[in-house]
């Protein structure tokens, strides 16, 4: 699922028939209507049944064959061995929930987090500090304990950056939400970014959804934010939609659904060139099998690497949560499959890419299995 604000149930260390059409001849009365011929068993044959069945079969095959072909291709994409050296570069990141800045977390929780992150490659924390209002503003009351968290992380985890994760729902598929077409709204988002940087954050992590491919207003907003963060010596990072697994698939999907889902590879590259870090949300893929999910992640990794400049830090999202629904099958979207897919994509496209990492989503839903698969597959393969 593409998420603008994490759900955050965290605990702390302390806690009728139609009329005949005009001109239609009525059927003969008195039993003179023709009847269907009888079969050998005495039952009446219906001449329309067999063509209908054939049509249904053809339609089913038209739907099934492409799905089987796509699934097979993804499963093949999951085959092979990752290249040596395709593991953490100590440039990973992690999304954290709102409890870290609203007062629910305490010093003991930071200590526990430090122990958890010890000897991992996680160097950036995207801490949910919003959401933004639809007009682009951000109430300071949304992050009352930000300064405490930033100081505590810098003390317990030297070298780890704390970025303000700011998101909102866009009015791209419904009447409510933020409208980036309004210059005043974009300007307010920039002011909100300045606000959190003044509060001590090391960067701004933007997640606006659903964001359609080719949105020029979004690119304009990123240009303005980049000017700000450069002047403040801070990081600008974004959460990015998945890339078309087939050319122009987002356009085809947009014809049949309100939610096109993917970005074009070209648009992904345009976004990547405007930020310091881009995190592709490579989860909620609707893949039904672990092998097809891993193959999909391998493909997404390659597509992203092809258009992300080497000066931009690319991260691939890992599903540190378990759900079972049509968009995310927990038995298929495992951390192990995601990590192996990332390593395969990296191996095939740019095995020596330095500014590259993975990003677990999200801390409060993570299980021990998630952490083990991350460590075994990526940190210590």
Task: Name each model-derived stretch.
Residues 211-215, 234-304, 327-347:
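Extracellular glycoside hydrolase catalytic/binding regions
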Residues 1-53:
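N-terminal Lys/Arg-rich, disordered targeting/topogenic segments
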Residues 69-73, 283, 306-381:
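Substrate-binding cleft of secreted/luminal carbohydrate-active enzymes
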Residues 130, 209, 283-284, 363:
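Flexible loop residues that form catalytic
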Residues 48-52, 70-94, 105:
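N-terminal carbohydrate-binding accessory modules
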Residues 54-73:
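Hydrophobic membrane-insertion alpha-helices, especially the h-region
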Residues 84-111, 116-120, 124, 128-274:
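Chitinase-like catalytic core of GlcNAc-active glycosidases
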Residues 125, 206, 278, 316, ...:
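Conserved, mostly hydrophobic/aromatic
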């Amino acid at each position: 699922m593409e998420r603008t604000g994490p759900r955050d149930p965290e605990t702390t260390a302390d806690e009728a028939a139609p009329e005949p059409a005009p001109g239609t001849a009525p059927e003969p009365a008195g039993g003179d209507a023709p009847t269907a011929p009888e079969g050998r068993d005495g039952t009446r044959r219906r001449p329309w049944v067999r063509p209908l069945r054939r049509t249904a079969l053809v339609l089913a095959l038209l739907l099934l064959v492409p799905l089987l072909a796509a699934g097979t291709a993804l499963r093949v994409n999951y085959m092979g061995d990752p290249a040596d050296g395709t593991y953490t570069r100590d440039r990973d990141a992690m999304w954290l929930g709102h409890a870290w800045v609203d007062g629910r977390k305490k010093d003991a929780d930071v200590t526990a987090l430090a122990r958890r992150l010890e000897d991992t490659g996680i160097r950036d924390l995207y801490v949910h500090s919003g959401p933004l209002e639809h007009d682009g503003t951000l109430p300071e009351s949304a992050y009352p304990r930000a300064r405490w968290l930033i100081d505590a992380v810098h003390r317990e985890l030297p070298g780890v950056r704390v970025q303000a994760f700011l998101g909102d729902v866009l009015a791209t598929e419904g009447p409510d939400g933020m409208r980036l077409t309004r210059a005043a709204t974009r300007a307010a988002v920039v002011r909100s970014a300045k606000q959190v940087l003044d509060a001590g954050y090391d960067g701004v992590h933007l997640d606006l959804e659903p964001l359609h491919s080719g949105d020029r207003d979004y690119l304009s907003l990123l240009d303005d934010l980049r000017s700000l963060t450069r002047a403040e010596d801070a990081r600008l990072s974004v959460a990015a939609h998945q890339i078309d697994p087939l050319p122009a698939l987002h356009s085809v999907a947009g014809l049949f659904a309100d939610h096109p889902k993917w970005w074009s590879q070209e648009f992904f590259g345009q976004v990547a060139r405007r930020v310091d870090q881009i995190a592709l949300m490579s989860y909620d893929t609707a893949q039904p099998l672990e092998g097809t999910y891993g193959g999909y992640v391998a493909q997404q990794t390659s597509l992203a690497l092809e258009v992300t400049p080497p000066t931009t830090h690319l991260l691939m999202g890992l599903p540190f949560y378990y759900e079972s629904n049509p968009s995310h099958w927990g038995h298929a979207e495992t951390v192990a499959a995601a990590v192996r897919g990332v390593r395969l994509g990296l191996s095939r496209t740019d095995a020596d890419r330095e500014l590259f990492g993975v990003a677990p989503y999200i801390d409060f839903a993570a299980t021990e299995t998630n952490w083990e698969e991350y460590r075994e597959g990526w940190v210590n393969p």
